[in-house]
């Protein structure tokens, strides 16, 4: 599982605005001239000092950060009461001057109450040269220029100003902090993500503007609800085409789909090979795009399908290998041909994005490993009973039963180590109808028998083979149905277990010295329904931590809505499988060489923005149909 930083992304440069002009609707959040105002300001650690001092236009706040242990030194400013009600405004602004002799970047953060691990804030950075002034702006609902946490402006509980850990002493002055803008205003240059209604992304009737057409060696005429495209025959236009881009300020979010369909009629007198492409920013035909082509007979109509599920394979030894594309960030569609001197004309009907079922799964899937050899089935659970087989699995245990060998996450009521605070509860794992189900929920209250944590809202569980089954090398496969509730973070993964002779649990599970975390299938619901990642972590989780992986494994589900993920682990080599197809490989001497055990988890959260839980969709379930492990005789 990826370990996320408290301040992920804080240092992407934000939108800057110079000058300290105040509008009529501005609301002062803190008056530095007010007696006793210091009580509303706190440092963010021992490496920050602050003072209210006299300025040219009244009192100001001076903040000094020094090198030390705090990675994000700065100040926290509280309201004069429980919260600020800024529902009449659209943003918070801070007028800041850099008093240092070096360039600095200051983050302005605006918070709602709540668990910090759910990131209930918006933030923006301001970069200032030595001696320069500027205004940092945080627009409600946006962070670092992109849509972020949906902040409630009526419940602003804190404003923070901080920097990264400085190499030498730095100082900045805050002249004013205010709420500004009218409620509902969007920041200039902001982007709205739009999901297709009824699957239709691009239609040519109401709402379509011809400004969305970029003719690249073509002529396009809108006729009814279709586009008539005539491609150039000029020798200079080798690949003439028409690009249909999103409206200004819009990105198409196709994360709920796994392919795009272009219905095209060939109006020419000869067969024509038509290329269709779905583009992100910076698409170059190989990266940041998905594409397909088809030959259409003269006078015929055909649907060209551009799948997000491709045969491009991630290679851990090749930078930016595999399928580099984001279905949630589509900027437009390109329809083009290869020019051969013959006139080509087509009609393009409305373009649709769909969630299609995949082809029939390979016959071998679930029955044997994907490569030949002398294999033995060493572990299997089809979850056909009514209770979990405790000879194979470990669940969160009551505290009275724990020993020094107990892995802390397997203690009933222990906090989840990943994502938003939740507690592990054994009863959240159940076996029914031939499936293992991991449940994450928000109960009205945490059961009395469990330890009380003031920030705990959710219950989840963890199911592992720790202390019951381990294996070095082999093929590990599981068929799973993923949850649909935003905020869920299910995973099928392996961790080291060197056995009791290695000592206390953390020595058994150390990812150094031949150990490694294998994230075979790791899924954030916010990615969309057909997209997961695989990752590998080693050498601990602190300064020496290393990782590699891919975030672009797109897939079809089978007829029942399941996917099957597999890992072929060989000495010095791993191969990733999705629904029986190779999706990734990595050859490296550092690949794990110690036994590993199986884990299923579904914490809340993840990395990046958009991981907040939709409580109305709870409980959420991560469903496992089976898990099977084979060992090759030569590795026993």
Predicted regions: what they are:
Residues 1-5:
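Positively charged n-region of N-terminal signal peptides that target proteins for export
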Residues 6-8, 262, 632:
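General helical structural elements
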Residues 8-18:
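Bacterial N-terminal signal peptides
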Residues 16, 48-51, 113, 223, ...:
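A sequence-level detector of short, solvent-exposed, charge-rich linear segments
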Residues 20-21, 26, 306, 376, ...:
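A subset of signal/propeptide-processing and intrinsically disordered low-complexity segments
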Residues 22-367, 422, 436:
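Beta-rich carbohydrate-recognition modules and glycan-binding surfaces
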Residues 358-636:
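GH16 jelly-roll
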